[in-house]
Amino acid sequence: MKFNKYFDHTNLKPDATKDDIRTLCEEAKKYDFASVCVNGIYTAFAKQCLSGSDVKTCVVVGFPLGAMSTDVKAYETKKAVEDGADEIDMVIPVGLLKAGEYDAVYEDIKAVRDACAGKVLKVIFENCLLTDEEKIKACELSVKAGADYVKTSTGFSTGGATISDVALMKAHVEGKCKVKAAGGIRDYNTAAAMIDAGADRLGTSATIKIMEGRQ
């Protein structure tokens, strides 16, 4: 796969404006990234900005805490798809996972999966808050629910992607889904190391810097 196609060019800042999202989309078209990743309020606008390109519109759901009801996540997903989302990055209910409420976590992921049938679903764990055993369980639940990717982090908590986490997730999805690394990927060497560890997609707001660092 071409290096540029590993990237979800991302702006999830709470103060992002339409001008910021327009710039994000123009950059993504210039470099032909896999997608732009935006908050739901900009789904339709990003889709419009990307018209005529191969760049996908990726939208976050239940972001960044994952701590709202499953019904709300399902509706948010349905609305994003109606507005033009090609890919959904959802956050699991981290507290329920840590409490061992695995059926509830599965149902949460499955509800979003059903709401974006035919679209790409990435499931965000927030690994900095989890033990290795919890990360492994989250992989199992995500695969069972039909996720296309498992994802390390939101980038909004206490830590981001690590090489060891990417390798752990890659091993425990057993080829049944892909791995996205996100959070703290800010230079070419880090991006390359994540890919070497098994990442199939990278989420970062430093994408242009990474591409320039490769040259």
UniProtKB/Swiss-Prot annotation:
Stored CDD domains: DeoC (cd00959)
Residues at the active site: D89 (proton donor/acceptor), K151 (schiff-base intermediate with acetaldehyde), K180 (proton donor/acceptor)
One annotated GO molecular function: deoxyribose-phosphate aldolase activity
EC number, UniProt record: 4.1.2.4
Pathway per the UniProt entry: Carbohydrate degradation; 2-deoxy-D-ribose 1-phosphate degradation; D-glyceraldehyde 3-phosphate and acetaldehyde from 2-deoxy-alpha-D-ribose 1-phosphate: step 2/2
Its biological purpose: Catalyzes a reversible aldol reaction between acetaldehyde and D-glyceraldehyde 3-phosphate to generate 2-deoxy-D-ribose 5-phosphate.
Protein known as: Deoxyribose-phosphate aldolase
Organism: Lachnospira eligens (strain ATCC 27750 / DSM 3376 / VPI C15-48 / C15-B4) (Eubacterium eligens)
Species classification: Bacteria, Bacillati, Bacillota, Clostridia, Lachnospirales
